[in-house]
Amino acid sequence: MFIIWVMIGSGYYTSSLCLKNVPVDFEKNGLYTSIFDIVAILVAGCLSPYAGIRKTLIFSGMGSIVSSSLVISLTEESSDSLAIFYTSSSRFFLSYGFAILYMKHAALFPTFFLGTSLGMCHFGKGFAMFFMPMVAEAEHPWPNIVLTICNTIWTAFAFFIIEKSAKELSEDEKYAQESHSQDSHQAS
């Protein structure tokens, strides 16, 4: 989970920074990728109760691999609309994957370790993002090659996620409620 979190976070940050290297109008590209980000987060929020984390991350990982690979193929002669679509779809899948990962994180860890695991994942993501501005300053295809490699790594790790069944989730919720009621009973 830590590797997936770090790779998605650093991939998102890299895609944000390397928008200026894609051969298209920067303002227009930034506007469309921001719109795609908002749509991705809304879709993730709507589908979150119905989608499993493993399948969703694999789907978004495959989409981000394909779209970031297509961004690598862009040249100065590429049409603006094609470049905008490729970069926006790459960001869409990264935003979708990160939103699902954030919302479903609690389903993968026991209640007592949830805060610790979120903190460790955020620390690792922050450490990896320290190096991403250096990557994004390279010439056009190289930041997107690194982005594609990051997307491939987290998609490969997503295949190994073991989800809890509905029964296990309800048992965890029941245990958390019992311990909460015991704590409030002892406080009074």
Map each language-model feature to its residues.
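Alpha-helical transmembrane bundle of multi-pass membrane proteins
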Residues: 1-188
